[in-house]
Amino acid sequence: MSDLFENVNKSAEEYDASQIQVLEGLEAVRKRPGMYIGSTSSSGLHHLVYEIVDNSIDEALAGFCTDIEVTIEKDNIIRVQDNGRGIPVDIQEQTGKSALEVVFTVLHAGGKFGGGGYKVSGGLHGVGASVVNALSEWLEVQVHKEGKIYQMRFARGAITQEITVVGETDRRGTTVRFKPDPEMFDDTVYSYDILHTRLQEQAFLNAGITIILTDEREDPPKTEKMCYEGGIKEYVSFINKNKTPIHPDVIYLSGQKDDAVAEIAIQYTDVYNESIVSFANDIHTPEGGMHETGFKAALTRVINAYGVKTNVIKGDDKVSGEDVREGITAVISVKLPEAQFEGQTKQKLGNAYIRTLVDGIVNEQLTEYFEEHPAAAKAILEKAMTANRAREAARKAKESVRRKTGLESGQMPDKLQDCNERDPSLCEIYIVEGDSAAGSAIQGRDSRFQAILAMWGKMLNVEKARADKIYGNDKLYPLIVALGAGIGDEFNIEKLRYHKIIIMADADIDGSHIRTLLLTFFFRYMRPLIEHGYVYSAVPPLYKLTRGKQQKVAYSDEERDKLSAEMRADNPNAKIDISRFKGLGEMDPHELWYTTMDPEKRSLRRITLNDAIRADQVFTILMGEDVEPRREWIEQNAKYVVNLDI
């Protein structure tokens, strides 16, 4: 690991039972698993792995672990092995039980609490191993420590094998194997990609740690070794791999005060949006917090000061925070004792002193960097000044949009057929491609809660456009006004007029293009819509099957064949009329209602954002200027395309 972290947060070499503190019992976990892991869906299933890996990361942060291996065995059994000191096996004074037993059977037991264990810990709630144990069909732990192998086994949280010495060893570390309990989870199949994303993130954030992910369900097994000596500098380069930097080097800033450490990596590219990713104790903080606030304030101050010093900025003609962040990619990682996470989803860092720490580091070290690298400083300042001029050019269009955003103004777009309901949580808006489909949708809808907005012509690709082109665009303007929440830094989800925003486009090239353009716009300028789960794509059926008065619709070739067989169950020779829907515009209002708009029958696909970094990269590839990465991406992913009318 880097020298910065080797000298910080090292506990005493002796990691024993005295450092394990017990706060409360484990009884409630199986009754209310969502309270401890968020949900029993896929995210909760994968959270089990993160909890065990976080224990190994804690050992790494303390300076005692360099290698972590995560394996998905057959039958979706998970194995996590590290070369840390090994969980203590001696008797824990508070309970009279071995520390190993306490860690796996008592909630909130671990070295994350109290003064003698880890000073910095990655676990958000610290629930850790005991919750994984409670929610597993079975769990087995082996500790290699002081020449012996200690083993315990559990079933749904209960001990089935007391701590036992099962052999001798010449290494140290902990190995945990567990099988998630199908009684607890909707699905127990692990996604290699989801685990890979999280583990790669951890490898970037902890420079020098080696994390190996293996999927033994594949034949041959799929393995990837992740180790990034450059840490978050490499993370920024990874994010920017399909973008064009305007200065060659990633800027790295770091510092510490007492037990708190901060490191920041920055690089500007020629894109028009910002990408700032922040972490506290290796936990992603998508809602930002004090570390981001300190970073943004200092960044704006330093760039303005450099502009004044070099006579590029004169008088009060300062650039704004929005200007200086155009095109920036930044990773901010802070590690601190007793991190306080705020907000409803606990995704915002609240420790006020971290703002001062990060502000001071950026103010001092970025100023120094600009002095030593005038070419990079000039390129960054020029980009901010260009953004400033574009922002000024966009101001009038922006004011026009702002004046017409509120419902009370009564100035809704001509293309909007609004609904009667005024409670946003009950309202939905269909964004419909073309006047023909919009006409059928308007006639077929339930006007009590369904609004229709027709889109026509070629939409603007916001990935290739600066803000001044977006605010006054005649295709985006009606959408911005209809939704009522503003865009960019001024977007306010509380003002959103509809909590279901449904893109309704054909399954052909043009429809897919419109969907992609809309999603690019939402991702870049209204991202909270996606983060809150308000954006959907309508899934119109491909086939209509008719037998006499009986009608059914199918969304795939497989479903068509299955329904056809079911409709002939009583008479194998019965005639089934199968017709293919050619497009939304060719459906009559009744067909459009019962296939695509009726809440009882329709199929909607919610647009989710599990991995913001990957999404950022994909939008850059698909919608950006560079053709070659797009060609490569299409070649790699073409095999996954089905049911596309060409």
Where are these regions (language model features)?
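Mature N-terminal segment immediately following signal peptide/propeptide cleavage
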Residues: 18-31
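GHKL-family ATPase ATP-binding module
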Residues: 1-16, 26, 50, 58-60, ...
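A short glycine-centered beta->alpha linker in the GHKL/HATPase_c
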Residues: 86-91
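C-terminal interaction appendages of subunits in large macromolecular complexes
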Residues: 389-408, 423-428, 439-445, 458, ...
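Conserved short strand/loop->alpha-helix "switch" segment adjacent to the catalytic nucleotide/phosphoryl-transfer site
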Residues: 31-50
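Short adenine-binding "F-helix/F-box" segment of the Bergerat
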Residues: 92-93, 100
